[in-house]
């Protein structure tokens, strides 16, 4: 609160006038009175409670029977969003009300904590997609699988089938702890510092669906890895644990908080603590409780952990964590070592038990349910019963005997899942886009897939010269679900002026990236004034800027480094 100089008024007592400030909606400071419609809906009824109404009322009564506060609010707590109505162009996204944009079908997000799937579970997801979702699935960049074209009448049966094999959609969306990211090679990699699976399982078992965390200010994202490649995009999660080796205390985790992208990107920061493995769940509970109790709730666009961290700083965050929420302070700890290895795990790799895992590239995450079923069959026919999606829209087949590796590689190729993809197929991810998302302005997956095909044709002979995966991330709106600010080439969907005409296109971000081998620290991409790309021009722009990079780079210079030093003209 700012304090002004005393103001003198004739005939009145002199007093200090204060600039009035509105409460931020912090429960621990301002109390729990709801300060906006979303908070009112959450206070009126916990989002977890809507499941019973879905099963007993809405599935019987159909879409028209759904209460709007459930449809546009609480359904998310069970992984359900209404889809975008087909045929509404991106220019109308901001003009129409949400109910005018929505179809009477749902996207359903299947929660896959740590990406840990059995082939039986994968087959069930594929069968559900084929039977109830028009044979369309998307692997997301948060290790989830999303189904489309789901009718409310079918939701209880889908839940029954998922839960019969140990899957669920609990808190897959909403103002809750979202799917927990974990290294896709947890427990199998020869070079991991520690297997984070026990810590992941403890958090999930204790806190998934816990009403004490079912009303957070907004979404809350967690990541944990024990792998030296730092393969869980920890810098852009609300709470992350990255394996480190303490000189006196052994292997544990470095704690990061406050990362997120969207329209106001902010990279997470270290609190400087060492978290022993046995205290990870306690520390996660403490950080999450801080967000619940002190997070800003009045304005939705300020309600992420990153805004609280920006105001508090890391010293206060650590002090509040240790003094108010932990049983005892944490020791100081070292920063993670520079990353080693490719975090997407594409290719054939030996496991610590002598078997192999094989990482394959999807095409921007889009797969049919039939393909998922065939993938489960392929894995099982070759001795594997485990698969794992990654945070890069890739998928791993685990536990393959050495003599079966060639058979799996060939089978993956037949499924359109190459384990030796081009640099462009390997490096490209895309969000859902205008096909299904009510927030989107531009098509993403089809445009990105077309660009991959074109770049493979035009630049195939240059791949040895390029010598690195140049990441291309395509997003349909400013919210950055596809992490555009942390890509070599990030494309943000918007309407752009091309030759005097307003058309769907993209704003370009260049030179972003998270910590990886050859890049010690994360950094956000730059934008170039006036640089816009039409929706059908992704490959044209990418080819142009890659060829300029090859012509202008210094020896050993990465694309990201070059993009930050190049002048605007070179980046057009």
Annotated model-derived regions:
Residues 2-572:
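Peripheral terminal and linker regions in Fe-S/redox and tRNA-modifying enzymes
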């Amino acid at each position: 609160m700012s304090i002004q100089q005393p103001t003198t008024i004739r005939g009145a007592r002199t007093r200090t006038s204060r600039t009035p400030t509105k409460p931020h909606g912090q429960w621990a400071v301002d109390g729990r009175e709801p300060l906006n419609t979303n908070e009112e809906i959450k206070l009126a009824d916990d989002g977890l409670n809507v499941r019973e109404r879905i099963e007993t009322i809405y599935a019987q009564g159909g879409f028209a029977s759904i209460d709007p506060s459930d449809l546009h609010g609480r359904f998310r707590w069970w992984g359900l969003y209404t889809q975008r109505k087909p045929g509404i162009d991106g220019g109308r996204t901001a003009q129409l009300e949400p109910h005018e944009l929505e179809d009477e079908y749902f996207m359903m997000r299947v929660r896959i904590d740590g990406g840990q799937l059995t082939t039986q579970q994968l087959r069930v997801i594929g069968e559900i997609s084929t039977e109830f979702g028009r044979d369309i699935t998307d692997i997301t960049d948060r290790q989830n699988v999303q189904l489309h074209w789901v009718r409310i009448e079918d939701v209880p049966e889908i839940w029954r089938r998922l839960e019969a094999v140990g899957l669920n959609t609990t808190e897959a969306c909403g103002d809750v702890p979202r799917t927990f990211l974990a290294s896709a090679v947890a427990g199998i990699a020869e070079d991991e510092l520690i297997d984070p699976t026990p810590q992941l399982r403890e958090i999930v078992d204790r806190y998934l669906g816990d009403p004490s965390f079912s009303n957070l200010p907004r979404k809350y994202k967690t990541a944990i890895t024990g792998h030296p490649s730092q393969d869980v995009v920890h810098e852009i999660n609300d709470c992350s644990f990255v394996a480190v080796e303490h000189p006196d205390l052994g292997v544990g985790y470095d704690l990061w908080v406050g990362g997120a992208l969207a329209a106001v990107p902010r990279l997470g920061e270290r609190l400087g603590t060492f978290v022993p493995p046995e205290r990870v769940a306690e520390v996660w509970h403490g950080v999450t409780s801080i967000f619940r109790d002190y997070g800003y709730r009045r304005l939705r666009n300020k309600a992420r952990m990153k805004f609280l961290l920006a105001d508090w700083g890391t010293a206060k965050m650590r002090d509040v964590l240790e003094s108010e929420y932990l049983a005892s302070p944490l020791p100081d700890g070292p920063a993670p070592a520079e990353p080693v290895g490719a975090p997407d795990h594409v290719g054939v790799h030996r496991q610590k038990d002598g078997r192999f895992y094989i990482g394959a590239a999807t095409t921007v995450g889009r797969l049919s349910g039939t393909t998922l079923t065939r993938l489960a069959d392929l894995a099982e026919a070759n001795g594997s019963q485990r698969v794992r999606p990654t945070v890069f829209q890739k998928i791993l087949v685990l536990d393959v005997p050495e003599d079966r590796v060639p058979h799996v590689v060939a089978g993956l190729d037949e499924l359109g899942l190459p384990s030796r993809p081009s640099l462009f197929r390997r490096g490209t991810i895309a969000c859902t886009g205008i096909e299904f998302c009510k927030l989107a302005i531009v098509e993403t997956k089809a445009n990105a897939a077309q660009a991959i095909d074109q770049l493979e044709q035009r630049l195939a002979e240059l791949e040895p010269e390029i010598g690195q995966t140049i990441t291309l991330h395509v997003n349909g709106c400013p919210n950055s679900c596809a992490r555009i600010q942390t890509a070599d080439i990030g494309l943000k969907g918007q309407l752009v002026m091309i030759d005097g005409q307003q058309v769907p296109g993209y704003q370009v971000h260049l030179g972003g990236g998270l910590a990886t081998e050859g890049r010690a620290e994360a950094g956000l991409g730059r934008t170039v004034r006036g640089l816009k790309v039409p929706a059908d021009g992704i490959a044209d722009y990418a080819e142009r800027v890659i060829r300029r990079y090859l012509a202008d780079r210094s020896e050993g210079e990465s694309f990201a480094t070059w993009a930050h030093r190049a002048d605007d003209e070179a980046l057009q």
